[in-house]
Design a protein with these regions (language model features):
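Extended, well-folded interaction surfaces typified by the phenylalanyl-tRNA synthetase beta subunit core
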Residues: 1-52, 222, 275-277, 283, ...
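A carboxyl-terminal module marker
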Residues: 4, 74-75, 88-308
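Predominant activation on well-ordered alpha-helical scaffold segments within soluble catalytic domains
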Residues: 34-38, 42, 58, 76, ...
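Mobile "lid/hinge" segments at catalytic clefts and subdomain interfaces of large enzymes
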Residues: 44, 48, 62-64, 68
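Acidic/polar loop patches that form or flank catalytic/metal-binding clefts of enzymes
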Residues: 47-55, 119-126
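A structural supersecondary motif
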Residues: 54-60, 252-255
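Conserved catalytic motifs of ABC-family nucleotide-binding domains
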Residues: 81
């Protein structure tokens, strides 16, 4: 736990101690999968296997108030994954067209593919609760109904962000790059991980999954380049675009990012690919223009300006 840079009082230091351990090194029940993932990665890297993509599913434990109340410890099933080195053939190239790196975006993409299989609404938000993750390259994973942010349920209901019958999103885990100081403890280079609580994830999954038929008509793609302040996260931009686009917006993605003198200090340019589609007909420019105008207006509310 010291190698994970966990300060005194951190929740992950609330470990379950064994009364008769086989050795001092195995005297506690693990509070996280991260240690065993890092051990496995170092084992492979030290044996000429620099490119690692591994996962583990198993129980993790927290003591809680079990000793004081003579109750059972907090045990839950967790799933974790780790990437280091070059990504294999399973991963697509980056938006720059280069081979993928084991970075935050690769781990988030892998996590997203998994969560989509659960048919769960999910989002991420910047987080600093895990000292073993790289500051600025770490996020909390939220899953479930409602607004994707750390806002209390009463506030959500009062502001209308939480519709009737919806639940506030649950924090189910983290995703990010391992802090360089922590990775160095295991003799690893750039490394990305995620870990989620499978029990919380199952509770957040949609109880009913609706079938969406395959589209029989082509989509209409339009690209936008928008300049935004650096603090505005791409995930926030995509969320606002989806809301503004309405039913005719089939998909949106970021395919380029630019920072430099042309956009000014503290700003960056995001290039967005917008895909419009209707289920029963081929859309025209006149059909998509209202949705595009709403998207431009929504980006303006975030402080964005279109680049020509």
């Amino acid at each position: 736990l010291d190698r994970l840079r966990l300060p005194a009082g951190h929740a992950m230091r609330d470990v379950v101690r064994l009364e008769n351990p086989l050795s001092e090194a195995q005297s506690t029940m693990r509070p996280t999968l991260l240690g065993s993932l890092l051990d496995a990665a170092r084992h492979n890297v030290s044996r000429n296997g620099p490119d690692v993509a591994i996962f583990e599913s198993g129980a993790v434990y927290r003591a809680g108030d079990a000793r004081a109340t003579h109750s059972l410890v907090d045990e839950h099933q967790a799933l974790g994954a780790l990437l280091t080195g070059a990504l294999g053939g399973w991963a697509s190239k980056s938006w720059r067209g280069e081979p993928g790196e084991s970075d935050f975006f690769a781990a988030k993409a892998l996590l997203g593919a998994l969560l989509d299989k659960f048919h769960v609404d999910w989002s991420v938000q910047p987080a600093t609760a895990w000292p073993f993750l790289h500051p600025g390259r770490a996020a909390e994973v939220l899953a479930g109904d409602g607004y994707g942010g750390s806002v209390s349920e009463p506030v959500l209901a009062e502001t209308g962000m939480l519709a009737e019958g919806e639940r506030p999103p649950a924090s189910v885990g983290f995703v990010g790059e391992v802090h360089p100081l922590v990775a160095g403890q295991w003799d690893l280079e750039r490394t990305a991980v995620f870990a989620i609580d499978l029990g919380k994830l199952a509770a957040a999954a949609a109880p009913v999954v609706a079938f969406k038929p395959f589209a029989s008509v082509p989509s209409l793609r339009r690209d936008l380049a928008v300049t935004l302040p650096d603090p505005i996260a791409a995930a926030q931009v995509l969320e606002r675009v989806r809301e503004a686009g309405g039913e005719v917006l089939d998909d949106v993605s970021v395919f380029d990012v630019y920072t430099g003198p042309q956009v000014g200090e503290g700003m960056r340019s995001l290039a967005l690919a917008l895909s419009f589609r209707a289920p029963d007909r081929t859309l025209t420019e006149e059909d998509v223009e209202p949705a595009r105008a709403r998207i431009v207006a929504a980006l303006g509310e975030l402080g964005g300006e279109l680049r020509v």
